Curated annotation (Swiss-Prot):
Amino acid composition bias (Polar residues), ranges on this chain: 166-178
Family annotation (Pfam families): SepF
Gene Ontology CC annotations of this record: cytoplasm
Taxonomy of the source species: Bacteria, Bacillati, Cyanobacteriota, Cyanophyceae, Synechococcales
Gene source species: Prochlorococcus marinus (strain MIT 9215)
The gene coding this protein: sepF
HAMAP family in the cross-refs: SepF
Compartmental location: Cytoplasm
Predominant place of localization: cytoplasm
Physiological role: Cell division protein that is part of the divisome complex and is recruited early to the Z-ring. Probably stimulates Z-ring formation, perhaps through the cross-linking of FtsZ protofilaments. Its function overlaps with FtsA.
Family: Belongs to the SepF family.
Region of interest (Disordered), residue spans: 151-191
Keywords: Cell cycle, Cell division, Cytoplasm, Septation
Protein name: Cell division protein SepF
Coiled-coil regions, chain positions: none
Amino acid sequence: MSLISRLKAVVAGDEYLDDDFDELDYASEDELNDIDNFKNSPRNKNALANANPFDFMNNNRSSKVVGMPGISNSSSEVSLMEPRSFDEMPQAIQALRERKTVILNLTMMDPDQAQRAVDFIAGGTYAIDGHQERVGESIFLFAPSCVNVTSSSPEEASPSSVPTENTPQYSLGKNTTPEPAWGNSKLSAYS
């Protein structure tokens, strides 16, 4: 039936909707009698009256508990990586995404690439709200947010700094405030 013919049928008062409802499956009289008998049965009335609706909810709720993947209370996994190039850094990021702690030993890398690698992994660690800690010279610990990292040393470890062999180390001595560089012909801190 087209839209125009249906509109004409509505205006004329014809029985236009009977065609649509004839296709539906109605319950037979036997089925209706079975439903009435079930409702009127004294055994079923008492069972439904004595039932606690909260018991049904608790039974269903316990079956819907799903564990989170990657989290286990029994053990945590630590991945030790000794990369030789920056190309191996996505593996460390993937390990962090899988909630594994990563110890990165960068002693076999070129210092410039090692700095780049630490910056890359530190960015990934920051993105997942993780923690980073310098363990030793060119050795770093990166942990996901589900791992608590505590340090036994009283001083804070400097995050994401790779010392190089050719970098001179400067000391300001006992004076903690540096002297201004302007007006002085000789910089005592750099000589």
